[in-house]
C-alpha cells in the first residue's frame, strides 16, 4: 500500500509540473522552452499511471484523492498559501477515499 501511495504522489507531481510550466509560460510570460520539460513531465505522468496494478478506472479514481493532497501541498509550498481547515479536511476525506479504493484492489 505504501509503494502504491508513493507511486500516486510521484504521478501527481509529474502531472502538476507538466501543467504548471505551460501556465507559467501563458500567465507569467515565461520562456516557451518550458513547454519541453512540461511535455516530458506529462509523458512521465502517463507512463507512471500504467505502473499501477489495477483496472484503469480504479487507478484514476484512487489517483484523484492523492492528486487533491499533492495539489494542496503544491499550493502551500510553491504558491505560499496557508492551508485552511477546509483544505485539510477535504484532503483527509479524499485520501480516505483513495485508501478505501486501493484496499479493495484484488478483492473484486
Swiss-Prot record:
Transmembrane segments: 6-26, 31-51, 61-81, 85-105
Cellular compartments annotated: Cell inner membrane
Pfam families reported in the protein's UniProt record: UPF0060
Entry GO CC: plasma membrane
Keyword Cell division in annotation: no
InterPro entries per the UniProt record, alphabetical: UPF0060
Membrane topology: Multi-pass membrane protein
Cytoplasmic side: 27-30, 82-84
Periplasmic side: 1-5, 52-60, 106-108
Keywords (A to Z) from UniProt: Cell inner membrane, Cell membrane, Membrane, Transmembrane, Transmembrane helix
Matches recorded under PANTHER family: UPF0060 MEMBRANE PROTEIN YNFA
Protein family (similarity comment): Belongs to the UPF0060 family.
Name this polypeptide is given: UPF0060 membrane protein YnfA
Amino acid at each position: 500500500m505504501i509503494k502504491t501511495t508513493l507511486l500516486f504522489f510521484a504521478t501527481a507531481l509529474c502531472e502538476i509540473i507538466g501543467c504548471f510550466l505551460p501556465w507559467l509560460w501563458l500567465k507569467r510570460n515565461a520562456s516557451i522552452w518550458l513547454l519541453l520539460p512540461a511535455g516530458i513531465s506529462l509523458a512521465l505522468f502517463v507512463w507512471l499511471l500504467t505502473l499501477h496494478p489495477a483496472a484503469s478506472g480504479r487507478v484514476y479514481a484512487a489517483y484523484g484523492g492523492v492528486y487533491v493532497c499533492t495539489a494542496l501541498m503544491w499550493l502551500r509550498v510553491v504558491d505560499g498559501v496557508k492551508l485552511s481547515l477546509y483544505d485539510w479536511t477535504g484532503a483527509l476525506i479524499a485520501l480516505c477515499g483513495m485508501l478505501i479504493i486501493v484496499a479493495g484492489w484484488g478483492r473484486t
